[in-house]
Amino acid sequence: MIQLSKCIQMNEVNSEYEALFSVIHPILYGLVMSLKQDIVSQIGGYKNMSLGMFTRMYVPGDGDCGICFEYAVHNAIISKNSDVLNRIDDALTKYCKIKGTDPSSILFGAEKSGQVQFIDSVMEHLTDDSLLLTGKKGQPIKLKKHINGVAAAFRKPKEREKLPSSINGLWKADLFVGNTLQDKWVGTTVKINPSQLESARGLRLGIVPSRQGKSDKITQHETKNLIICPVPYDYSFMEIFYEGWDIVKQFINAKSEMPKEINLPGSLDRTVCKHLVDRKNYNVLDVIEYLKSMAQPHLLDVANESANIDSTVTDKKISVNRIVAPISSLMY
């Protein structure tokens, strides 16, 4: 069980300055709440924790929080957002030999920057007959049979050698997208930046945000064996989230001091970060409330909920216990 913060876009980004405060406060709150509670109790609770103290207590990977664009795509599919579903259905039907009117998604890589690969109820969604289609000649792979090996391969390169050669890159998948009635699926990679799409054996579908002024045509990449499927998304909204994430991370890495310019070179980013530096001696929850007051009004609606995400990895505790998922208004 992990905590999920859905940051749902309600309006367009009007002011980058105010928008950064809008996204920083749920990110910072998520990181603060991800601290181990026994450590928080030792100082008498959050009421005794300053922002600067938090940066010294925080250990990356020791109860962490991640931004997850993959979840935004996954959520749009399972919530049956018609604009997104139509795009996915076209890609599956025309290019992946998976016909049907009700595409579905299984979230596989909930947080790739953590130390553990998560499986989101994979065993509930897959059957013993679930087939993985790779776009290559040969018999389809029975996915459930190999799912534990794929998860292990994410963490241990040596485990990749144990996978069938046709899917030895499947550990790079973010989602499995397909049709539950046909019980056919494709390994799917999700990237905010299309140039970061990479081929790997076992991957078939590449989902990227559509961009204004660019073609949103579904295409088959000539060399990567990937079907590229742009989906509606407010690109500027996503950029703001990653920019805000970087500001918070650099501030933490600098232990509440102003980060070196090489680490945070943008003038606007440094201006926003200075608000954090100037308040390092104030209570961390009070600082978060201050950040809310500086935010663009009505840009975000933050909904917190618990999510069942099961890990197939048994030799290590889950290191990521909270996900911040930016969800564009075009996807909701």
Where are these regions (language model features)?
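Long, compositionally biased intrinsically disordered regions
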Residues: M1-I39, I247-Y332
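Active-site beta-strand-loop-beta-strand hairpin of nuclease catalytic cores
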Residues: I167-G169, F176-T188
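A short acidic/basic microdomain associated with nuclease active sites
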Residues: S79-G169
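Catalytic cores of nucleic-acid endonucleases
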Residues: F154, K162-L170, V190-V277
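Nuclease-adjacent, charged terminal/linker segments that flank catalytic cores
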Residues: M1-C96, S329-Y332
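A short, polar/proline- and glycine-enriched secondary-structure boundary/capping micro-motif
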Residues: K47-S50, K97-S105, E198-G202
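Hydrophobic transmembrane signal anchors and adjacent membrane-proximal interface regions, especially
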Residues: I2-L4, M10, S82, N86, ...
